[in-house]
Amino acid sequence: MLMKAQTDKSLLLLKECLQKEVMMNAKSFSWPRVIHKAIKCPRRRYYFWWRIASYWYQNKTGFLKQAALRINRKLTLKYGTEIELGARIMPGLVISHHQGIVINGSAVIGHSFRIRQNTTIGITGSNPSKLPISIRIGNNVSIGANSCIIADQIIIGDNVVIGAMSFINKDLPDNSNVITEKTLRITVRETEPQDLKSVSDS
């Protein structure tokens, strides 16, 4: 009975995700409408297939779970986006550009999450403290391009904006704007590089 209730809850969540990310309108949910949008709108197909694969992976066994893994491998190859199926992402996911996105399977991410190209949400790989992996990101979080969130345990609050080219390895409070300060350094060479000089001489 408990397992059935959990499955029903997961199915309702799946439908809400597809409503917001694939249908993207106020019409009532129906599978024909979702499938029609997935076929008609190529930019929405990733959301459709990843949500289906995620649901199968987390709620099914045997053939469907293996099918979910195959679907996700194909999505990774086609879109250059690797979101592990263990990741739990609430409705409203927005991927501005797909290339180079990686999200670890331990991530738990809230509603209306926006992520951009060449961004990684991952773990250190060493975990010297041996504590359980926990990557938690709140609601209404936006991450700029070319950013990295790397930690074995981290909490990012609600309504956080992370600027492009940021490195995050510490907790962030609610309602914060975060950037990693960068310094542009330009030096003028005193001599012409050897490889360019040899080309000009020839």
Where do the model's predicted regions map?
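Right-handed parallel beta-helix
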Residues: N127-K130
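Left-handed beta-helix
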Residues: Y79, L85, M90-P91, S96-G105, ...
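Terminal amphipathic alpha-helical/low-complexity segments used for targeting or macromolecular assembly
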Residues: M1-Y79, E190-S202
